[in-house]
C-alpha cells in the first residue's frame, strides 16, 4: 500500500493529456453545464488511509451510483423478497430501455437499470411520504460517509423531473403491471432526488467502504450489512453495474463497480479498498471515458482485479 499515492500520481500523469475526452450528458440540462475539463480520483483502504489526485474534493452528481445505496436500503427493509420485484441478470440493453420491460411483464432485469432502480425506490418508500424516503437515503449516505455536509442538488432533481419522460414511461409501465405500489409521480420524485445526490470522490469512496470490508465500515466501526450481503451487492455491480458496458468493464477492469451519467464511477477491490473516480465526459454507453481508463490502469498496476493479477 505504501506506494499507492505514487500509483495514483502516475495514473493522473497518464490521464492528464486526455482530460476533456468523451461527451458530457446533455439530456439532463443541469449536467450539460458541467465543465468537462475535470478529473478526480480517491481511494480509501480498509485500514482507513485516503489517497487522492486531481479534483477529488469537487462534488458532482452521482446519478446512478445512488442505486447501490438505495439497493442496500431496500434489502435492509425486505431482504430477499426484493427479488420478486426485480431480477439479477445483466440487461444488455440501454439503461432506459422500455422494450425489455414489456417483454418481461414489468419485472426489470436488475436493480441498476432505470426501471429496476425505480422499483427499488418504490420498495424503500413503503410507509413513507416521498420527502421522508429522500430524507432516509440522505441520512444513510451521510452515516456511511461519516459526513453531514453531503447534500442533494435540487436544481439537478428539478432538471431531471422536467426532462425525464422515458422514466415516467418506465414507471407507468411497471404500475400497469402492478410492480409499483405508490403513485408514479411520488416514486419518481424520490428517484430523481436520489440521482441528484452530490458527492466528491473522497466522500463516495468513504460511503462505499463497507462493500470492500465485508459489510462494515472499518473507520467508523459501523456495521452496515452482513458479509454475505456485501458479497452479493458486489456481484451485482460486477455483472450489471455499467449498463450495457458491464461485460466490457469486467473484461478491462475486473472490479465490481457502478457508474453514473454524471461521470462518476465507484469501484470496490474486496478486502482492500473502495475507489471513486470522476470525469464528466462519457463514452457511447454512458460511462465515464477517463474514469474507466483510470480504473483499468489502477487494476493493471495494483493487481487488484478480482480475477487475479
UniProtKB/Swiss-Prot annotation:
<dbReference type="GO" id="GO:0004359">
    <property type="term" value="F:glutaminase activity"/>
</dbReference>
<comment type="similarity">
    <text>Belongs to the glutaminase family.</text>
</comment>
<feature type="binding site">
    <location>
        <position position="114"/>
    </location>
    <ligand>
        <name>substrate</name>
    </ligand>
</feature>
<feature type="binding site">
    <location>
        <position position="261"/>
    </location>
    <ligand>
        <name>substrate</name>
    </ligand>
</feature>
<dbReference type="InterPro" id="IPR012338">
    <property type="entry name" value="Beta-lactam/transpept-like"/>
</dbReference>
<comment type="subunit">
    <text>Homotetramer.</text>
</comment>
<feature type="binding site">
    <location>
        <position position="64"/>
    </location>
    <ligand>
        <name>substrate</name>
    </ligand>
</feature>
<feature type="binding site">
    <location>
        <position position="167"/>
    </location>
    <ligand>
        <name>substrate</name>
    </ligand>
</feature>
<dbReference type="GO" id="GO:0006537">
    <property type="term" value="P:glutamate biosynthetic process"/>
</dbReference>
<dbReference type="InterPro" id="IPR015868">
    <property type="entry name" value="Glutaminase"/>
</dbReference>
<keyword id="KW-0378">Hydrolase</keyword>
<feature type="binding site">
    <location>
        <position position="160"/>
    </location>
    <ligand>
        <name>substrate</name>
    </ligand>
</feature>
<feature type="binding site">
    <location>
        <position position="243"/>
    </location>
    <ligand>
        <name>substrate</name>
    </ligand>
</feature>
<protein>
    <recommendedName>
        <fullName>Glutaminase</fullName>
        <ecNumber>3.5.1.2</ecNumber>
    </recommendedName>
</protein>
<dbReference type="Pfam" id="PF04960">
    <property type="entry name" value="Glutaminase"/>
</dbReference>
<dbReference type="GO" id="GO:0006543">
    <property type="term" value="P:glutamine catabolic process"/>
</dbReference>
<feature type="binding site">
    <location>
        <position position="191"/>
    </location>
    <ligand>
        <name>substrate</name>
    </ligand>
</feature>
Amino acid at each position: 500500500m505504501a506506494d499507492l499515492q505514487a500509483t495514483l500520481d502516475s495514473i493522473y500523469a497518464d490521464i492528464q493529456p486526455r482530460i476533456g475526452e468523451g461527451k458530457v450528458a446533455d439530456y439532463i440540462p443541469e449536467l450539460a453545464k458541467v465543465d468537462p475539463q475535470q478529473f478526480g480520483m480517491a481511494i480509501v483502504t480498509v485500514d482507513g488511509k485516503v489517497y487522492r489526485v486531481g479534483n477529488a474534493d469537487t462534488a458532482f452528481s452521482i446519478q446512478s451510483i445512488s442505486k447501490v445505496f438505495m439497493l442496500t436500503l431496500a434489502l435492509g427493509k425486505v431482504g430477499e423478497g426484493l427479488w420478486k420485484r426485480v431480477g439479477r441478470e445483466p440487461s444488455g440493453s440501454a439503461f432506459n430501455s422500455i422494450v425489455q420491460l414489456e417483454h418481461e411483464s414489468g419485472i426489470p432485469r436488475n436493480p441498476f437499470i432505470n426501471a429496476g432502480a425505480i422499483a427499488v425506490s418504490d420498495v424503500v418508500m413503503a410507509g413513507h411520504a416521498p420527502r421522508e424516503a429522500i430524507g432516509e437515503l440522505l441520512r444513510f449516505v451521510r452515516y456511511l460517509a461519516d459526513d453531514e455536509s453531503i447534500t442533494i442538488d435540487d436544481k439537478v432533481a428539478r432538471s431531471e423531473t422536467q426532462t425525464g419522460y422515458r422514466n415516467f414511461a418506465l414507471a407507468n409501465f411497471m404500475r400497469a403491471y402492478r410492480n409499483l405500489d405508490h403513485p408514479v409521480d411520488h416514486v419518481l420524485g424520490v428517484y430523481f432526488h436520489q440521482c441528484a445526490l452530490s458527492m466528491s470522490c473522497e466522500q463516495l469512496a468513504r460511503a462505499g467502504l463497507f462493500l470492500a470490508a465485508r459489510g462494515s465500515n472499518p473507520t467508523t466501526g459501523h456495521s452496515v450489512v452482513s458479509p454475505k450481503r456485501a458479497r452479493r451487492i458486489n456481484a451485482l455491480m460486477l455483472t450489471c453495474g455499467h449498463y450495457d458496458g458491464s461485460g466490457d468493464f469486467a473484461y478491462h477492469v475486473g472490479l465490481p463497480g457502478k457508474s453514473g451519467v454524471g461521470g462518476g464511477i465507484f469501484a470496490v477491490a474486496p478486502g482492500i479498498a473502495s475507489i471513486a473516480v470522476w470525469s464528466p465526459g462519457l463514452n457511447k454507453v454512458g460511462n465515464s471515458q477517463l474514469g474507466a481508463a483510470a480504473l483499468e490502469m489502477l487494476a493493471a498496476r495494483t493487481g487488484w482485479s478480482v480475477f487475479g493479477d
